[in-house]
C-alpha cells in the first residue's frame, strides 16, 4: 500500500508503492503456466515443455512484466485514492530497503499545477478591424489579372498590338536567353543554359543578371561580371565572381486580360455579370478579413491571458510537447519530399520555449473553460463547419467530409472552444479597436 505522499518541489511528488510478494508470485506462476501451453523449445512438442523448464528460462522476463503491470496498477489506485492529478508518466525505482514479504518502489512524478487567472478586466487587447471597399476589390482584380497574364512577341503585330515601338527588353517582359558563365575562364556546373526563360523584374535571377538583360534586343549579347552572394545556395560558387555572357533569343511583352464578361466567367460568374463578380470578390475578401482578424485577436487574447496568469508548468508535459513538435517537424519535412525525414536528427531542445508556451496556454485555457462553461456546443461546431464549407464549390461534400472523421471534428471543436474563450475575454478585457488596411492585416496575420 502507499505511504504518505512526499512533496519534493513545487510540482514534484514521491510516493511508495508496495506489492505483496505472494500476490506477485501467484501472477508469475499463472503467466508461466499460460506460456507453457504455447512456448516452443527444441526437443519438445508445443504444450509439452515441462513447467519447471519454462520457469527456468522465462521466469526473469515474466517477473519483470508482472512487476511493471502491478506497479502501474497500484500507482493508478494510489493516485485516485489520494486525489493526485498526475502530469505525465511516473518513474519507478526500487527502494534500497526491501521488506521480506513485499516489493517496495518509489514512484516519482509531477502533478498538475494550480492555475491562478488574474482579473480579466485588467487584460489589454488591441483588436484589428478593417473594411473592404472598391480599392481592395480593384487590387484583388489586378492580382487576378496578373495571374492570367499571357505574352506576345515584342515587335510583332497581333490581336493586342505589338507592344510598342521600343523592342528592347523591359521589366515585366518574359525573355528567353542563352548564357555561359565561367570562373577563372572555367565553366562551372549550372553556369550554362540554352533557351532559358524568365520574367524580368520578378527577382528570380540575381540582380546583376537581370540588369545585364535589361535593354537588350533579340540577337544582342552582353558580357558582365557577377559576384555570387556569400550565402548562395550553390556552395561551389558562393562568394566567387563569375563572368557571364548572355544572348537574347526572344522578348515577349505581357498582356493582361481586360475586365469584361469573359474575365468574369473565368472567375466562375456564369453569366459574366461584372457587378456580381465584384460582389463575390468583396464577399470573399470580407470572409478572409474576418479569418485574419480572428487569428490576430486570438493571439492578442492568448498573450493577455498569459500575462495575468500564475502557474508552474510540469516539466513532463513540456518534454512530451517537445517530442510532438519534433514529430510535426519531421512530418512537414516528409511532405516536402525530404529523404529519410522520419529519422531526421531534430533536437527537441529547439522547441523548448515554444512547448512551454503551448503547455502553459493549454493549462490556462482548460481552467478558464472549466470555470466558465465555455465548452463547444454541437450547434456551434456545425455553424463553423458550415461557414468553412461556404468557400468551396460543393459545401455539402465538405460538411460530410468533416463529420466522417472524428479527428477533423475534434480539431473544429478545439477551434470553437478557443473562439468561445476569445469572445469571453473580449467581453471583460480592456479592448482597443484599431482600423488597419487589408494589406496591413494580411502582413500582420502572416507574422502572427
Swiss-Prot record:
Residues 172-257 form the PPIase FKBP-type domain. The lineage of its organism: Bacteria, Pseudomonadati, Pseudomonadota, Betaproteobacteria, Burkholderiales. Its main location: cytoplasm. PROSITE patterns: FKBP_PPIASE (PS50059). It catalyses: [protein]-peptidylproline (omega=180) = [protein]-peptidylproline (omega=0). It comes from Burkholderia orbicola (strain MC0-3). It is found in: Cytoplasm. InterPro entries: PPIase_dom_sf (IPR046357), PPIase_FKBP_dom (IPR001179), Trig_fac (IPR005215), Trigger_fac_C (IPR008880), Trigger_fac_C_sf (IPR037041), Trigger_fac_ribosome-bd_bac (IPR008881), Trigger_fac_ribosome-bd_sf (IPR036611), Trigger_fact/SurA_dom_sf (IPR027304). It is an enzyme of class 5 (isomerase). NCBIfam families: tig. Involved in protein export. Acts as a chaperone by maintaining the newly synthesized protein in an open conformation. Functions as a peptidyl-prolyl cis-trans isomerase. This is Trigger factor. SUPFAM superfamilies: FKBP-like, Triger factor/SurA peptide-binding domain-like, Trigger factor ribosome-binding domain. Keywords: Cell cycle, Cell division, Chaperone, Cytoplasm, Isomerase, Rotamase. Belongs to the FKBP-type PPIase family. Tig subfamily.
